[in-house]
Every structure is written in C-alpha cells, then in structure tokens.
From Swiss-Prot:
<keyword id="KW-0342">GTP-binding</keyword>
<feature type="binding site">
    <location>
        <position position="192"/>
    </location>
    <ligand>
        <name>Mg(2+)</name>
    </ligand>
</feature>
<keyword id="KW-0378">Hydrolase</keyword>
<dbReference type="InterPro" id="IPR027417">
    <property type="entry name" value="P-loop_NTPase"/>
</dbReference>
<feature type="binding site">
    <location>
        <begin position="282"/>
        <end position="285"/>
    </location>
    <ligand>
        <name>GTP</name>
    </ligand>
</feature>
<protein>
    <recommendedName>
        <fullName>GTPase Obg</fullName>
        <ecNumber>3.6.5.-</ecNumber>
    </recommendedName>
</protein>
<dbReference type="InterPro" id="IPR036346">
    <property type="entry name" value="GTP-bd_prot_GTP1/OBG_C_sf"/>
</dbReference>
<dbReference type="GO" id="GO:0003924">
    <property type="term" value="F:GTPase activity"/>
</dbReference>
<dbReference type="InterPro" id="IPR006074">
    <property type="entry name" value="GTP1-OBG_CS"/>
</dbReference>
<feature type="binding site">
    <location>
        <begin position="212"/>
        <end position="215"/>
    </location>
    <ligand>
        <name>GTP</name>
    </ligand>
</feature>
<dbReference type="GO" id="GO:0005525">
    <property type="term" value="F:GTP binding"/>
</dbReference>
<feature type="binding site">
    <location>
        <begin position="190"/>
        <end position="194"/>
    </location>
    <ligand>
        <name>GTP</name>
    </ligand>
</feature>
<dbReference type="GO" id="GO:0000287">
    <property type="term" value="F:magnesium ion binding"/>
</dbReference>
<feature type="binding site">
    <location>
        <begin position="165"/>
        <end position="172"/>
    </location>
    <ligand>
        <name>GTP</name>
    </ligand>
</feature>
<dbReference type="InterPro" id="IPR006169">
    <property type="entry name" value="GTP1_OBG_dom"/>
</dbReference>
<keyword id="KW-0963">Cytoplasm</keyword>
<keyword id="KW-0479">Metal-binding</keyword>
C-alpha cells in the first residue's frame, strides 16, 4: 500500500550530567576538582535513501528516540557522546513541524541529511567551575534535554512520468501493460485512489518511473473529489502523459476532457503548465475512436503530437515509450523550492522576529505565580538540585535575569508559591 503522509514523534538524546568529584591520590595534596563533563546526546537525523519509494515503513514505527550521552566520571573523564539516530526516508520527503507548520526539511537528493531534532549538550563537571576564588567547587550541571517534536512526513511522488486524465480513461491498464505494476483495475470511477508506481523499460536500454495517479474531475483545483491529493503528487512529475478516452465510450467529448484537465492543472499551480505534456489517445480499438481522433486533431495545434494506442491490445506502445524516454532526456527536474515561487500556506517566509524574552510571569486563580520561557526552563533543567552550590548558582542566575524584581512588581510576597515546570517553591523577599 502507498502511504504518502504520516505523523511521527522524534526525541533527541539528552546530554549526560556533569560530575562532582575530586582528585584523591597518595602524595597529591590538594588534588582539586576532577569531575568530568557529560557527553552530548544523539541527534535525530533523516537521510535520503534512493532505494526507498514509500513511507509505508512508518506505519509500523512512529516513535523515534535517540540515545542519551553518558554522564561525566571521576578523574576528569568525560562521558561518551551518543551516536546519532539515523532514519532513512525516500527521495521527495518533506518534513513539517506539526505544531508550527514550519517546513523543517525538503529532502530530494540521495544521501542528503537533515537534523530533525537536536540533541542536548552535556552538563559541565565541577572542574569547569574552578576559579581562584573557589578552587574546589561542589557544583555541576545536568545535561541539556534533547529536542522533541511531532512531525509530519509528506512524500511527493518522484515519478519521472505521471499519467493524468479523467477516471476510467485507461491509465491503470496502460501502467499494467508497460511495467510490472499491478494496479487495481475495474469498470468504475476512482478505482485508483492512491498512486501506483511502475518501472518502465522503453525497450532500448532506457527506463523510467511511471505513476498512475488518481483520476481528476472538474473542480479538483478547489479540492473537489480527490483533487488536492492528486495535484500534490504531480508537482514533481517531470513529464505529464495526458491519457484521453478517444472512443468517448462514457459519453464524454475528448477535446472537452483535454481542456478541462489542463484547466485544473493551471488553476492549482500555473507552473504545472510548463511541464512537457504528451497526449495519448487511448482505446483506439473501440468504435468511433478513429473519427474522434481526427476531429480532436483539428482542434489542437498542428505541432502537438498525439500518440494513438490501445492499452488492451498493446498497439502503439513502443512508439509512445520511446517518445517519453526522449522527452525525459531533455527535461530537468523541478525541485519544490522552484515550484513554489508564489507565496502560499506552505511557503517559508523569513522575516525579522524579536528574540523571545528570557522569562514570562503569569498568575493562576489560586494566586500561584507561574514562570515560563525557553531560557529559564533550560537553566532549571540543567541545575543539579542535589548540590547546595548548584542551587545557590541557580538563585544567582534568576536574580541576574531580573526574576526576583519582576515577581515583586507582580505583587509576590514572602511565602507565595512560584511554579516552574512541574516544581513549586516559596518566594522569599
């Protein structure tokens, strides 16, 4: 089954804790601090693997947690850093942050790497805090927590060729006879509801990937039917093969179908009309097909080639496949960052944003003061509260940031409860 969107959770490794230790050896008086630093945690890294074609593996594993760094040790030995957690994804994967909607990475080239969740650095051991005024400090840092994210992976099919057309014009049948793909084929509309991929051999040593995409209907560019799902898949297709039922067996007019499909492509994304398009007149083994083809040719430009075929009887296929292979050789790829030139909801618009304040103060109905903010929360989680010296250092950091004064201005008095993350303490004026 083809899966083109999936939501997963990623958690980078925490940094290892720093250690409080002292050098105690015979004949070495006043050995001094010897606590090592914690090791760096592991990043969560996505790497493009050209051998993967779908996101189906993520249906069975949706939680990815990287390893933590080792804690610091005595004798000034640092903890070992953890190895990055490498997650392989197919070409064309877009990674979005679910909470912010930001595009984190657009992975299109084999071997391309992107850090999706950054690891925390290791906490410093007490050797790092030695000063002339305090040569034997009894404080250390905890490791920094690793970043965690809920992300959505979106795969835009990286097929060389995309088959487009109204439902039941023979796209799935065509793919099944020119490749080893076995799409579902039936005599009703929307038999194909997800893309089917097939490797096609042109017969002269050249090959390409062809995608049988779900059928379009009028209004698809506004999301009617399978509209946006279909059009999302065709954005990176290099060559569009427009399949038309030339027999008109369903009471449709071939030229009107041709114009309607092109209109939907243009309405969705004007750049799609720049794709080379090959017109395929299918079902030429049916009555009235030849007459309809002649009429169709009179309504389009003379320099637009039309390839009459019958996917059922397999006539005209070799000429079509060679023409597609020739067209691919002269057609570049269309990366997403070139396609989305116009600003839309997926565009990353870079603008100046003021730095986030070090902390914010709010108050709950019961009178509790709540501290929040990335910087103050980071300082808190990296403080070793088992050591009095570390607690004193944290208090000095809060004072230097202006937290005490800000609480007083908000009306805090002796004994009031102040909450930071899941911990509470009393305010002392």
């Amino acid at each position: 089954m083809f899966v083109d969107q999936v939501k997963i959770y990623v958690k980078a490794g925490n940094g290892g804790d720093g250690m409080v230790a002292f050098r105690r050896e015979k004949f070495v008086p006043n050995g001094g601090p010897a606590g090592g630093d914690g090791g760096k945690g592991a990043d969560v890294v996505f790497v493009v693997d050209e051998g993967l074609r779908t996101l189906v593996d993520f249906r069975f594993k949706r939680i990815f947690k990287a390893e933590h760094g080792e804690h610091g040790m005595s004798k000034s030995m640092h903890g070992r850093g953890a190895e990055d957690l490498v997650v392989k994804v197919p070409q064309g994967t877009i990674v979005k942050d679910i909470d912010t909607g930001e595009i984190i990475a657009d992975l299109v080239a084999h071997g391309q790497r992107a850090v999706i969740a950054k690891a925390g650095r290791g906490g410093r051991g007490n050797k790092r805090f030695a000063t002339p005024a305090n040569p034997a400090p009894e404080l250390s840092e905890n490791g920094e927590p690793g970043q965690e994210r809920n992300v959505q992976l979106e795969l835009k099919v990286l097929a060389d060729v995309g088959l487009v057309g109204f439902p039941s014009v023979g796209k799935s049948t065509l793919l099944s006879v020119v490749s080893a793909a076995r799409p579902k084929i039936a005599a009703y509309h929307f038999t194909t509801i997800v893309p089917n991929l097939g490797m096609v051999d042109a017969g002269d040593g050249r090959s390409f990937v062809m995608a049988d995409l779900p059928g379009l209907i009028e209004g698809a560019s506004q999301g009617v039917g399978l509209g946006h799902q279909f059009l999302r898949h065709i954005e990176r297709t290099r060559v569009i093969v427009h399949v038309i039922d030339m027999s008109g067996s369903e009471g449709r007019v071939p030229y009107e179908d041709y114009m309607a499909i092109n209109n939907e492509l243009e309405q969705y994304n004007l750049r799609l009309m720049e794709r080379p398009q090959i017109i395929v007149a299918n079902k030429m083994d049916m009555p009235d097909a030849e007459e309809n083809l002649n009429e169709f040719k009179t309504k389009i430009a003379e320099d637009i080639p039309v390839f009459p075929i019958s996917a059922v009887t397999k006539t005209g296929l070799r000429e079509l496949l060679l023409a597609i292979a020739d067209k691919l050789e002269t057609t570049p790829e269309f990366p997403l960052n070139e396609i989305l030139e116009q600003e839309d909801e997926d565009t990353v618009l870079y603008k100046y944003v003021a730095d986030e304040p070090d902390f914010e103060i709010s108050r709950e109905p019961d009178g509790t003061f709540v501290l929040s903010g990335a910087k103050i929360e980071r300082l808190f989680t990296m403080t070793n509260f088992e050591r009095d010296a570390s607690i004193s250092r944290f208090a000095r950091q809060l004072r230097a940031m202006g937290v005490d004064e800000a609480l007083r201005k908000r009306g805090a008095k002796d004994g009031d409860i102040v909450r930071l993350l899941d911990y509470e303490f009393e305010f002392m004026d």
